[in-house]
């Protein structure tokens, strides 16, 4: 009261700050604020009310100006999360990383030390507003590639590192179609890759490693390995709108109901769910393509049909660590 803080703001703060207090916090503050002659008699050191009459709290403009001095910010459309890049001490631009609670708390602490009364929720709200520029990691990567020369079959060379027991040319043809469809689904909301690409072979034959290395380092974060195949969760639905490839290990462990769910997932064009702590459902495009590994040739048991699966039994795979992928060539051709 004496420092000029509005009763409603002070009461709201106290209720949250002393949530475990059994007494009537609001009644205590009503009693204190009855002494109207004391209101605003003491200056708040280093802090003065804003002209906008917002009870002395930092305005949106104040917070945005402060954030401009701290780092670069962007909103990742694939992950639905804010990212930040902090400049190094030498002035070099830093790499973008996802914002976490510790970083937001640090921003609040730094701004408070500058003499600003700021709500941490206001900082979060601004970071999740139009203040942060939109960033699409897939557009950023693919538009930066050099055009394909129209001749060199980079995808064919990549497919040739997998040696299958069936006709090699058939495998290479289907892999090329699956890979091109996976890239198309990143950019066209009406395109969904309906087929599930599966490598069958013994353990230790580089199946998962080869699939994992399909994505370039810049997009490696968008490869997801699903090892718990016993159930399909809400998080699995969100993964359809976030990742490029979802790899299901040991898919022979899938039960009949899970197989049916996965078949339905492959044709689902959008994900319409509410994320944890979000206020509204999000209507997000299905961008992921599914792949998998198994050592069981007889993993398909659906008598109604298996046209969504592209299974190939391998005899061997060239060591992915000694046979690196020509990412620029492969993806300029696929794009």
Give the label of every model feature segment.
Residues 1-154, 166-173:
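N-terminal nucleic-acid engagement/recognition segments and initiation subdomains in replication
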Residues 129-241:
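P-loop NTPase catalytic core of nucleic-acid-dependent motor ATPases
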Residues 235-241, 275-293:
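AAA+/SF3 P-loop NTPase mechanochemical coupling elements
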Residues 243-267, 300-305:
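Conserved AAA+/SF3 P-loop NTPase catalytic/coupling segment centered on the Walker-B
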Residues 246-249, 274, 287-295, 311-312:
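Structural recognition of the conserved hydrophobic beta-strand(s) that form the central parallel beta-sheet
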Residues 259-282:
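Conserved catalytic/switch belt of AAA+ P-loop NTPases
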Residues 300-319:
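A short helix-turn-beta junction within AAA+ P-loop NTPase domains corresponding to the substrate/partner-engaging
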Residues 314-335:
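C-terminal, non-catalytic macromolecule-binding modules
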